[in-house]
Amino acid sequence: MAAKMRAGLTLMMVCLSATAMAQTPPAAEPAKVIRLPDIRMRDVCILPDQASKTYYMVGPGGRGVRAYTSKDLVNWEGPRMIFQAPDDFWGEIPIVSIWAPEMHAYKGKYYLFLTFDTRNKFPEQWRNWLPRVTRGSQVLVADAPTGPFKAFANHSTLPVDMMTLDGTLWVEDGVPYMVFCHEWVQIKDGTVEYVRLKDDLSATDGEPIRLFHGSDAVWLKKSEQYGCYVTDGPYLYKSKSGKLFMIWASHSQTGYTTGIAISDSGKLAGPWRQQAEPIYTKDGGHAMLFTTFDGRLMMVLHSPNGPAARPRIFEMEDTGETLRITKEFTAPSQP
């Protein structure tokens, strides 16, 4: 009898232990840490989040946005998906991919500026030309940099009959604007344009205004196949001199290239002039600028411009007349 009681107690303890184990939630997997040189991602943007003293680096991931976080720009945790486009995001127009995400903190909210690509053809198509399709920049909003991000509408923030990409935020005299590219696929000579936004960035408040054509830059190489001029990735920075600088990308004799346009008036409306010499010519571009928590001006771009693209960070100097690279920011060697 005693043996049966002991066996029964043992069985009960095993069952209770199994029940307790089943009710215990699994331990969270430790965050994956990866060093900057080992990250493979293009069209990157880094937001120094003042609230958390954390750097958020975002980039495209299929129909979503990937994010890494870091405290030192060397060791990064991630990636994690902070946004994934639902099947019906643009109604009956399927989203194929997301390009060039940017994250901005503005008036207590976090915003993603995204380019959505589709295969939905416009009525007008050209012979021996790439498909002219629905493609546009759109603003999403969240209360935190990790989301959830929500759209204001089920279509591009910019006019839906324009092929637009690489939208970025610029605030001048308290007024928000989107600066973006009107794609060469639609107009042959790509442009950089701007449009005023509503105060909550939910929609445009006016019509787009052209700032310059790609062909305005003497360093830009016209496409031999299409005879076009590409404009990519505008990003703005107010110089200590009061001038307004815009870095942007296209192709030159050496590959993907980052150039700089300058508004001597310091105003977004310009007029804009193109610096003859680009600031980066080693097959890298789609750059943006940010300031570290200790006050250093940095530029991040992707290079090379192909499947092996990775983020590269450079320390910059604002001379008052232009921007120039002083050195590449590199991760210290591991012991």
Language model features with spans:
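Bacterial N-terminal signal peptides that target proteins for export
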Residues: 1-9
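Bacterial N-terminal signal peptides
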Residues: 8-19
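Carbohydrate-active catalytic/glycan-binding domains of CAZyme proteins
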Residues: 23-335
